[in-house]
From Swiss-Prot:
Native source organism of the sequence: Homo sapiens
Name the record gives this protein: Broad substrate specificity ATP-binding cassette transporter ABCG2
Resulting phenotype, L555A: Loss of protein expression
Glycosylation sites: N596
Extracellular side: 417-428, 499-506, 557-630
Side of membrane Cytoplasmic, spans: 1-395, 450-477, 528-535, 652-655
Quaternary structure note: Homodimer; disulfide-linked. The minimal functional unit is a homodimer, but the major oligomeric form in plasma membrane is a homotetramer with possibility of higher order oligomerization up to homododecamers.
Main localization of the protein described in the UniProt heading: membrane
Length: 655
């Protein structure tokens, strides 16, 4: 059995215009007829850990075992029960599986797959990953802008988009939003066709689909398969996994690959599968769906199958008596290995590979891009901004909440006085403003978590670099959503509270609140990047902010904390924001206007000036005492964003 990493590099001269290697004869007709994908001795194993945490031991599990086959232009279905390995095989063929634990060869027209195979082939995931706030046409435009060559004019790209829309029958809904849980959009079938259209933009010779009928009713599922059948007649090689198709869908299949427990039960023409199982002693009842019949055989849970096996027990026993004592899956696998279908497949595989072992070359999982970094950044930012405007619950609602909260706080603390109560109220409202900015930034955890599947799919497909996506999301989503509330909040609260009537103090407060929001949001991204569940990231963020509040400077005087604990204050975002706001507001204030500052003060214990209050809080009165807090927040922003980027960069993108 040959063993290699599945991806290899080949010279450009060996590929055609679609990025796939040509046949040995270099016949141009092969391009229009599609590509022939063959797989030789595919084995896939994963290492799992079993047992309790103290003594967990790694256990190797075999997902695919010695799988061979050929996928030609047409509809190639991979059928099997849940957990049988059909999705794993599809991912292996599409070069979307982690190479570790993988062995075997996958060839295109008898040559190794090109390094950019993932970008030149199409792959439609099971859960449709399209931007719901955009229209069908806008989603296709995004795919065309990032996956088609920059040498193509906008007119040529629009022609390609219109052709795909017409081919998929999306003319009537082309300018309708796809839809989200808050926005009513297109139907399930139209959404699935939009996902297919995103891949057809590159005009791939090979199209992979992971269970394309999932979540669709029988009529819609039938319509989707009829569409795929029509596409296959145009010369495309369409490979898809499917769980339990109805007969009207099954009869459309050109090739059938039947898997169970990672073993091959059958591989060959779909319409000859019934005859194959009949020769093995399994007879399908009249009016029974062949696909259901095959699954019944594998699972061994059909009464009809049991009766038929009982009728043919003698004949089967004569042919292979030893198989009666073996597990059903192993028995069916051996029957296939000894069949004429297997021998014909092996002979054709030998002919395709030229009878020679391919040179094994270890390569990294590199992804090629057709567009530049700046081009990708512009389109990712544009889409993110449209998504922001199309999500009222995330944009308009947040602004409304900010306005209402600002008015409420302004009413509670309205017209702060310059007396002892003014000191307490000022400190209280400044502390609230700081902590509110922190907890409002918890919503930033959704920025990468919600779009995780979309990001992974588009990144592997070569839409954009991680850096383009990361920076684009920051510029179009994070910056405006944290900057605008800070501006609104400052404009409302500052004048209602009657804070220091100086322009520079007003803008320093606004800038401080923005820096607190950015640093808290950056921390949220650092925690949430790579996470799959929003609730887990939100819980971690809340715990961190509650801990930081203790060291903010209001709940405890930081000068009184023991030295072995005082260093924790330097990790508190609210502490830097609260200190800067106090320095900005209290410096130069007089809270005992009726007393002569130069005379003897009968109330020596009272705090009469802002400077006295700041000194008691351990705050430096110099200008550096103000700006060092902003420098610290800026450093935290850089550190947290770097962590978030690295987590996205090294995120496990292959299953």
């Amino acid at each position: 059995m040959s063993s290699s990493n599945v991806e290899v590099f080949i010279p450009v001269s060996q590929g055609n215009t679609n990025g796939f290697p040509a046949t040995a004869s270099n016949d141009l007709k092969a391009f229009t007829e599609g590509a022939v994908l063959s797989f030789h001795n595919i084995c896939y194993r994963v290492k799992l850990k079993s047992g309790f945490l103290p003594c967990r031991k790694p256990v190797e599990k075999e997902i695919l075992s010695n799988i061979n086959g050929i996928m030609k232009p047409g509809l190639n279905a991979i059928l099997g029960p849940t957990g049988g390995g059909k999705s794993s095989l599809l991912d292996v063929l599409a070069a979307r599986k982690d190479p570790s634990g993988l062995s075997g060869d996958v060839l295109i027209n008898g040559a190794p797959r090109p390094a950019n195979f993932k970008c030149n082939s199409g792959y439609v995931v099971q859960d449709d990953v399209v931007m719901g706030t955009l229209t069908v046409r806008e989603n296709l435009q995004f795919s065309a802008a990032l996956r088609l060559a920059t040498t193509m004019t906008n007119h040529e790209k629009n022609e390609r988009i219109n052709r795909v829309i017409q081919e998929l029958g999306l003319d009537k809904v082309a300018d309708s939003k796809v839809g989200t849980q808050f926005i009513r959009g297109v139907s399930g079938g139209e959404r699935k066709r939009t996902s297919i259209g995103m891949e057809l933009i590159t005009d791939p010779s090979i199209l992979f689909l992971d269970e394309p009928t999932t979540g669709l009713d029988s009529s819609t599922a039938n319509a989707v398969l009829l569409l795929l059948k029509r596409m296959s007649k145009q010369g495309r090689t369409i490979i898809f996994s499917i769980h339990q198709p109805r007969y009207s869908i099954f009869k459309l299949f050109d090739s059938l690959t039947l898997l169970a427990s990672g073993r091959l039960m059958f591989h060959g023409p779909a319409q000859e599968a019934l005859g194959y199982f009949e020769s093995a002693g399994y007879h399908c009842e009249a009016y029974n769906n062949p696909a259901d019949f095959f699954l019944d055989i594998i699972n061994g849970d059909s009464t009809a199958v049991a009766l038929n096996r009982e009728e043919d027990f003698k004949a089967t026993e004569i042919i292979e008596p030893s198989k009666q004592d073996k597990p059903l899956i192993e028995k069916l696998a051996e029957i296939y290995v000894n069949s004429s279908f297997y021998k014909e497949t092996k002979a054709e595989l030998h002919q395709l590979s030229g009878g020679e072992k391919k040179k094994k070359i270890t390569v990294f999982k590199e992804i090629s891009y057709t567009t530049s970094f700046c081009h990708q950044l512009r389109w990712v930012s544009k889409r993110s901004f449209k998504n922001l405007l199309g999500n009222p619950q995330a944009s308009i609602a947040q602004i409304i909440v900010t306005v209402v909260l600002g008015l409420v706080i302004g009413a509670i603390y309205f017209g702060l006085k310059n007396d002892s109560t003014g000191i307490q109220n000022r400190a209280g409202v400044l502390f609230f403003l700081t902590t509110n900015q922190c907890f409002s930034s918890v919503s930033a955890v959704e920025l990468f978590v919600v779009e995780k599947k979309l990001f992974i799919h588009e990144y592997i497909s070569g839409y954009y670099r991680v850096s383009s996506y990361f920076l684009g999301k920051l510029l179009s989503d994070l910056l405006p959503m944290r900057m605008l509330p800070s501006i609104i909040f400052t404009c409302i609260v500052y004048f209602m509270l009657g804070l220091k009537p100086k322009a520079d103090a007003f803008f320093v407060m606004m800038f401080t609140l923005m820096m607190v929001a950015y640093s808290a949001s950056s921390m949220a991204l650092a925690i949430a990047a790579g996470q799959s569940v929003v609730s887990v990231a939100t819980l971690l963020m809340t715990i961190c902010f509650v801990f930081m509040m203790i060291f903010s400077g209001l709940l405890v005087n930081l000068t009184t904390i023991a030295s072995w604990l005082s260093w924790l204050q330097y990790f508190s975002i609210p502490r830097y924001g609260f200190t800067a706001l106090q320095h900005n507001e209290f410096l130069g204030q007089n809270f005992c206007p009726g007393l002569n500052a130069t005379g003897n003060n009968p109330c020596n214990y009272a705090t009469c000036t802002g400077e006295e209050y700041l000194v008691k809080q351990g705050i430096d009165l110099s200008p550096w005492g103000l700006w060092k807090n902003h420098v610290a927040l800026a450093c935290m922003i850089v550190i947290f964003l770097t962590i978030a980027y690295l987590k996205l960069l090294f995120l496990k993108k292959y299953s």
